[in-house]
Each structure stands twice: as structure tokens, then as C-alpha cells.
From Swiss-Prot:
Pfam families cross-referenced by the UniProt entry: Metalloenzyme, PhosphMutase
EC number: 5.4.2.12
Keywords tagged on the record: Glycolysis, Isomerase
Record-stated family: Belongs to the BPG-independent phosphoglycerate mutase family. A-PGAM subfamily.
Pathway info: Carbohydrate degradation; glycolysis; pyruvate from D-glyceraldehyde 3-phosphate: step 3/5
Task of the protein: Catalyzes the interconversion of 2-phosphoglycerate and 3-phosphoglycerate.
Enzyme class: isomerase
Reactions listed under catalytic activity: (2R)-2-phosphoglycerate = (2R)-3-phosphoglycerate
Keyword Transmembrane helix: no
Protein name: Probable 2,3-bisphosphoglycerate-independent phosphoglycerate mutase
GO annotation (BP), single: glycolytic process
Record organism: Thermotoga maritima (strain ATCC 43589 / DSM 3109 / JCM 10099 / NBRC 100826 / MSB8)
An MF annotation (GO) of this entry: phosphoglycerate mutase activity
């Protein structure tokens, strides 16, 4: 079977270059009252950049397939998201520094609100990180083991936390214990092979125990657990692309994904401005920077149009600071679309901008979904973005005679 990444890696040179991949999570959208958030936002810097760039749109997995953030990012990093199917749990776990061994299965969890039958709020009202941490501590004190499996809880950001299951004979081919939508009955975990059936049984029992411990909490009284995974084996980004790579991201899952592919995690603050300050401070230490902005996705999922617009404008304001660093290539895109009307990830193509001195500049006037749809790059698979970035950076040899 043809491995595109392996093929490209043989053409990568040792040529030094600086590449910035700025990912606005869930960037793509569809019009509300005639405009998408990208169109409605005041983005003079992104629009000026578009005039000097090649634009296009990406398909993260396949046309019509709605990707999770894991597949969306893996694709942007040049990995085949179908070949490398990774549970979100390992990403979240690595992102908060959880040690994962051979006997471990890790999963991502949300605190939720339910009435005993129906899940009312999949995020329990998005509690503050500090409040969630206290609940995680309570669970750690009350629940330590189910059957012969040790249970360990780790706090994450806001409503998120990680569960590690440690024991013999555990599998990770487990369906999500999550109805995926509010107002629906609970969907319990199911194992798809014998080892995973054991894991699913433990997971479902754990959720019932969590509900019992939290029964007096009016908001945080339930948990949804998904993204079950063991530690996967992936080719490492620095070896594939011959670049020292650093990741600047505030949310654990994205830090975990970057760590999984071999990027170094760069500590940063909580705001977009903090992330760009970190980028400038560490500019001489890395060849490739992955910078992640989360809130475009969060507000898309919450159906908050104006808030998504404001995050886009916040990013626009820092574009001159990135350009002033004079990267050889600046890529701006998303990992998937999260349309405000849908309040969820979607299959829609994702806007893509590539800026370098070798672009066919002057053909686009603004950065939005519709300019990108008729851009010079056309519609490409997201896993080709890295190949293009390397080409624009002068890091690929000619193929063939």
C-alpha cells in the first residue's frame, strides 16, 4: 500500500527553514444572515495577507466525512488519519503529562448533567477548571478500583478530565459512552472484541459509581467517557520532515497530539497574545511551530456567532507580529469546520492560506470560505498541507530525472 508520508519524507532536504502552522480550531463555517464569521469579522491583516498568498480549502478525511479534532490535526501534520486512528484519550492524557504504560487504557471524559434518563448538558455548564479539579479530587478519594482494574483520575481544563484504567487484559476498541447530543438518553460503552468488552464493563460501572458520588451536585452529577486508547506507534515528525518542531497550545488534547508525533511542548499562557509572545521568545529554538487557537471551535459548538467573530478578530490583530518574524512559510487554516448553526463539527471544507515569497500573489482579495473555495490551491486533502509547506520553504528535492 502506498504511503504518501513515507514517499514525501525521502524528498525532504536538510535545508533550514522556518514554518509556522497557525490552526484556528473549527474555523470553517456556513453563512448566518448571509455571512460566515470569517466574512463578518473585521480582518484587515488576514485580508492583506490573502492578497499575497495562495488560498484553497482542505478536506481533512474524505468528502462528506465529519472529522474529530484528532484526525483533523493528524491530517494537517501530514499523517493519514484513516491509517492512524487514535483515540482522543491518549491525546488528552499526554497533554496533561499522564504516564501511559502497556497495561493502561486512557480515555477522555466530560462532566455532564443528567436527570437519570436523559443527558441534559454534555459539559455541565462548562464549570471553571478549579471547580472541576475539586470534583476530580473527590472522585479520586471515592473510586480507586473496579474489579481488578485500578482507576486514576486526572483534572483537565473546564469540564474535561482524563481517566486511566490499569489492569490485565484491557482493550481499547470501545465505543463512546456518550450520546453525543443533549436531550438524548445515555449511550453506554460497548466492547468490540473480548479484551475491550472487559474495558467497556468497567467503564459503565465507573460511570454509575460517579453518578452515585455526585448525586447531590445539581450541575456536575454525571460523566461521559470516550476516546479510549492505548499508546500508539507513529512516525515522528522531526525525523519525517527533518525539522525541530515546537507546539504552542493551551489545551491538553492538542499538546498531547503534538507530543505524540514528536513535537516539543512549549509552555505558554492562556491567551492568543500569550501564544504569540511565546512564539517570538522561542523563535530561534525551532524550525517548525504549530500554534493552536481553541476558542473558534468552542464558540462554534456553543452556537455563538459574535463570539466566534471576536476570536477571529483577536487572531487578526496578532498577524503582523507573526509576519514581522519573517517566516519562510506561514500556513493559516483550521483542523475542521464547526458551523455555528450546527453547533458541531461538520464535513464542510476548511479555509486554507499559505504565505511565502513563492506564492501566486494577487489573485485573492480576502480570507474567507468563499475566496478560499476559488483560490489557486483548489480543494486538497489536508494531509497535503505539510507537503506544500515544505515545497514553499524549499525543503523538497525534485522527484525523478
Amino acid at each position: 500500500m502506498f504511503d504518501k508520508q513515507e514517499f514525501v519524507s525521502k524528498l525532504v532536504t536538510e535545508e533550514k527553514a522556518k514554518i509556522v502552522l497557525l490552526v484556528m480550531d473549527g474555523l470553517g463555517d456556513i453563512p448566518v444572515n448571509g455571512k460566515t464569521p470569517l466574512q463578518a469579522a473585521n480582518t484587515p491583516n488576514l485580508d492583506n495577507l490573502a492578497k499575497e498568498s495562495d488560498l484553497g480549502q482542505t478536506i481533512p478525511v474524505l468528502p462528506g466525512i465529519t472529522p474529530g479534532s484528532g484526525p483533523g490535526h493528524l491530517s494537517l501534520f501530514g499523517y493519514d488519519p484513516i491509517k492512524y486512528q487514535i483515540g482522543r484519550g491518549i491525546l488528552e492524557a499526554l497533554g496533561i503529562g499522564v504516564e501511559v504504560g502497556e497495561k493502561d487504557v486512557v480515555a477522555r471524559a466530560n462532566f455532564a448533567t443528567w436527570d437519570g434518563k436523559v443527558v441534559l448538558d454534555r459539559r455541565a455548564g462548562r464549570p471553571a477548571t478549579e471547580e472541576s479539579a475539586k470534583v476530580v479530587q473527590l472522585l479520586s478519594e471515592k473510586i480507586k478500583k473496579i474489579e481488578d482494574v485500578e482507576i486514576t483520575f486526572y483534572p483537565g481544563k473546564e469540564h474535561r478530565f482524563v481517566v486511566k484504567f490499569t489492569g490485565e487484559g484491557l482493550g481499547d476498541k470501545v465505543t463512546d459512552a456518550d450520546p453525543q447530543k443533549e436531550g438524548h438518553p445515555m449511550v453506554w460503552a460497548e466492547g468490540l472484541d473480548e479484551p475491550s468488552k472487559k474495558t467497556a464493563r468497567i467503564v459503565n460501572e465507573l460511570i454509575k459509581k460517579i453518578a452515585e458520588v455526585l448525586k447531590d451536585n445539581p450541575k456536575i452529577n454525571f460523566a461521559l467517557i470516550r476516546g479510549f486508547s492505548k499508546y500508539p506507534d507513529l512516525p515522528k515528525f522531526p525525523q519525517v520532515y527533518k525539522m525541530k518542531a515546537g507546539a504552542i497550545a493551551t489545551y491538553p488534547m492538542y499538546r498531547g497530539l503534538a507530543k505524540l508525533v514528536g513535537m516539543e511542548i512549549i509552555e505558554t499562557g492562556q491567551t492568543v497574545a500569550d501564544e504569540i509572545k511565546t512564539l517570538k521568545e522561542k523563535w530561534n529554538d525551532y524550525d517548525f511551530f504549530y500554534v493552536h487557537v481553541k476558542k473558534t471551535d468552542s464558540y462554534g459548538e456553543d452556537g455563538k456567532f459574535e463570539e466566534k467573530v471576536k476570536v477571529i478578530e483577536e487572531v487578526d490583530a496578532i498577524i503582523p507580529e507573526i509576519v514581522s518574524l519573517n517566516p519562510d512559510v506561514l500556513v493559516i487554516t483550521g483542523d475542521h469546520s464547526t458551523p455555528v448553526p450546527l453547533k458541531a463539527h461538520s464535513w464542510h471544507p476548511v479555509p486554507l492560506l499559505i504565505w511565502s515569497k513563492y506564492t501566486r500573489r494577487g489573485l485573492s482579495q480576502a480570507f474567507n470560505e468563499f475566496e478560499c473555495a476559488r483560490g489557486t490551491l483548489g480543494t486538497i486533502h489536508a494531509s497535503d498541507v505539510m507537503t506544500l509547506a515544505l515545497a514553499y520553504a524549499g525543503k523538497l528535492e525534485k522527484f525523478g530525472a
